[in-house]
Structures are given as C-alpha cells and as structure tokens.
C-alpha cells in the first residue's frame, strides 16, 4: 500500500523501528546462559592435575600432617590438668603426671602443680609455677600415696598419733618444691588421686616415696575394706617386704610395737571413728 504523500521517509524509518519486537526480555536469560557456559568452560579449561604434581602435593600433605600431629601432641602430652577430678579415665593405669609439689597436707598426701612436658616444655626457665594461694587455688592435683598409711596428724578435733609429726616432716623435706612423677591409678572418696610417687633428688635417680617411707618405719601397709591399691602384685610384694624388714629392725613407729597401747594408723583411725560415732549418738 502506498503511503500518503505527506508521509516522509524519516517517518517511515521510525515506524519500521517502532515495529521491531522488543528484545529486553530475551537478553537476561541469554546473559545468564552465556555466564554459565563461560564458567563451565573455565572449569573445564583449568588444569587440575597441576595440584597433584609432587612439587605441590608433598608440601601440602606434610604441612597438614604436621599441624594434626602438633595438635595431637598438645592434647596428649602438653595439656595441663588443674585438679585431680579433671584427670581423664584414659590416664588411669596408663599414664603418669609430672608436677611440682606445692604443699604437704599429711604424712601420705600432698598437692602438685601439673607441669606437662617438664623442663622441655619450658617449666622452670620459661614458664614459672605459681606460688601464691590465690594463683594455686583450684589449680593443684591432690595426691594420695598408694599402698602406704602414715600416722595421723592432729585435725578435726582429733589428737595426733605417735610419729605423725615425724612422718609429715620427713615427707615435707623430701617433696616440697621438688619435681615428682605420679603414676595414677584411681580416684578416692576425698577427690584425690591414688598414685605411686617418684621424687627426683638428682636428675636421673627417682626415688619411690612410698617404699622409702616403709623402709624408714614412717608408714605401714595400707589396709582397707575395699582393697588397697599398690599398682600391681610386684609392687605390693616389694612394699610388704620393706615393711617386714622395718618391723624386724624396729625402725620408726615399730619401736613401740611391743607396747600394749601400740596402734597402727588403721587401728587409730578406726578408734577415732568409733569415738566420733559415740559422741554423735549421745
């Protein structure tokens, strides 16, 4: 059809342009599709085998293994245990604890500040053991020496047993401020851990403290209704032999064994418990 005579060529061009379909709605899917294709092409074009080359793979494996190994070592050997109740069951009869003695409460128990790793971990020259009561509060492990029973000190209104002071003084002189290693066996009813204890008087000569107390006549074999803890039959035999020899020689508390009023630490505690029960019933 012929356009009217007054219609110009420019108008015709504008009409042609306006009659073209809009392409905006088709552009966005096209862009997304193209981007997806570009990413897939880039991924496929990446040479992933480059990361498997020995020059890249070996350092990565070594670094990862080193980090995991360091974490395991820290958790197993360098983590500090604040109190006896925090000792993991996996430690009992399997591991030992190294620490510095901060106080001696009686003739057969004391407290240590756990120093995992010892001098190799910097304790004593890079890291200091606290000394104030405030710093040590809730930060010491209460240890009961396995297999031995020392004479009682005066406490809770009870009198002191003969040789109680001597046993306490001996243990204090041997342990206070020293490094010890405790082979832990089990917890007891007083939130302590029962352990065989070795004190380092010299660098390479640890001394079994419980065994030495028996030899000096400053303790007896621990006898209990539920069974005493020695750390094994061999250790028990060694302790009983030491007690028998001290008794034969009349050392320490065995000097007065012939006396009619002589009491073992176990007999003394049983008598005190009976007196306390009698007071409670009246």
Swiss-Prot record:
Protein name per the record: Probable endonuclease LCL3
UniProt membrane topology term: Single-pass membrane protein
Amino acids binding Ca(2+): 149
Domain TNase-like, first and last residues per copy: 95-256
Localization (cell): Mitochondrion; Membrane
Pfam families per UniProt: SNase (PF00565)
Keyword Metal-binding on entry: yes
UniProt-listed Enzyme Commission number(s): 3.1.-.-
Designated gene of the protein: LCL3
Entry keywords, A to Z: Calcium, Endonuclease, Hydrolase, Membrane, Metal-binding, Mitochondrion, Nuclease, Transmembrane, Transmembrane helix
Family the UniProt entry places it in: Belongs to the LCL3 family.
Active-site residues, Swiss-Prot/TrEMBL: 144, 152, 192
Recorded GO CC terms: membrane; mitochondrion
């Amino acid at each position: 059809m012929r356009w009217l005579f007054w219609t110009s060529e420019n108008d015709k061009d504008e009409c042609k342009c306006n009659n073209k379909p809009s392409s905006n709605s088709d552009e966005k899917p096209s862009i997304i599709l193209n981007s997806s294709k570009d990413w897939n092409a880039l991924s496929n074009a990446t040479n992933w085998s480059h990361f498997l080359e020995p020059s890249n793979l070996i350092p990565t494996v070594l670094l990862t293994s080193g980090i995991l190994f360091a974490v395991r070592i820290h958790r197993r050997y360098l983590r500090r245990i604040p109190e006896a109740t925090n000792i993991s069951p996996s430690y009992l009869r399997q591991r030992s604890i190294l620490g510095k003695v901060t106080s001696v409460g009686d003739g057969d128990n004391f407290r240590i500040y756990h120093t995992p790793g010892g001098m190799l971990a910097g304790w004593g020259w890079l890291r200091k053991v606290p000394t104030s009561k405030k710093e040590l509060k809730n930060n010491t492990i209460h240890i009961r020496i396995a297999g031995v029973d020392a004479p009682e000190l005066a406490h809770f209104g009870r009198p002191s047993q003969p040789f109680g002071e001597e046993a306490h003084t001996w243990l204090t002189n041997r342990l206070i401020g020293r490094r010890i290693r405790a082979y832990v066996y089990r917890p007891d009813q007083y939130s302590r851990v029962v352990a065989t204890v070795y004190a380092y008087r010299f660098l390479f000569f640890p001394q079994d403290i419980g065994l030495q107390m028996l030899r000096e006549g400053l303790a007896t074999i621990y006898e209990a209704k539920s069974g005493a803890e020695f750390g094994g039959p061999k250790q028990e035999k060694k302790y009983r032999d030491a007690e028998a020899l001290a008794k034969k020689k009349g050392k320490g508390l065995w000097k007065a064994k012939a006396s009619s009023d002589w009491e073992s630490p176990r007999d003394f505690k049983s008598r005190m418990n009976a007196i306390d029960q009698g007071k409670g019933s009246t």
